[in-house]
């Protein structure tokens, strides 16, 4: 049995779909930080079957929760102070995403004018589809 201790102060990213923890770990560039980080994979979960957890021993880290909600909307963020949960955030799919998804349409203005931000709006929550603000190109976050 593997035992991971609690953290005194920091952030716990919980209820990550199994296998998605490494994506979040890499997105947050946690391999190059000065503080302790634990990526725990394939943990038993009564709710998900298996899940991943990331524990970050630094509550000052700047995290874009919108992007985490795009990667996995089932995530729970726990802000820890003195080994107790101070705040709990449940993520969801963001309604608007800016400069995270890139438009693939070669005729889109964002392909020609590099300074224009890539803006997408959620159009279908079940299919996890977003639409480009400028050219209406559909982007599926989860490919079938």
Curated annotation (Swiss-Prot):
Q: Which InterPro entries match?
A: Asp_carbamoyltransf_reg_N, Asp_carbamoylTrfase_reg, Asp_carbamoyltrfase_reg_C, Asp_carbatrfase_reg_C_sf, Asp_carbatrfase_reg_N_sf
**Alphabetical keyword list:** Metal-binding, Pyrimidine biosynthesis, Zinc
UniProt binding sites for Zn(2+): 103, 108, 132, 135
**Necessary cofactors:** Zn(2+)
Single GO MF annotation: metal ion binding
Q: Which GO terms describe its biological process?
A: 'de novo' pyrimidine nucleobase biosynthetic process; pyrimidine nucleotide biosynthetic process
**How is this protein annotated for GO cellular component?**
aspartate carbamoyltransferase complex
Family designation: Belongs to the PyrI family.
Q: How does it assemble?
A: Contains catalytic and regulatory chains.
What is this protein identified as?
Aspartate carbamoyltransferase regulatory chain
Q: Which organism is it from?
A: Clostridium tetani (strain Massachusetts / E88)
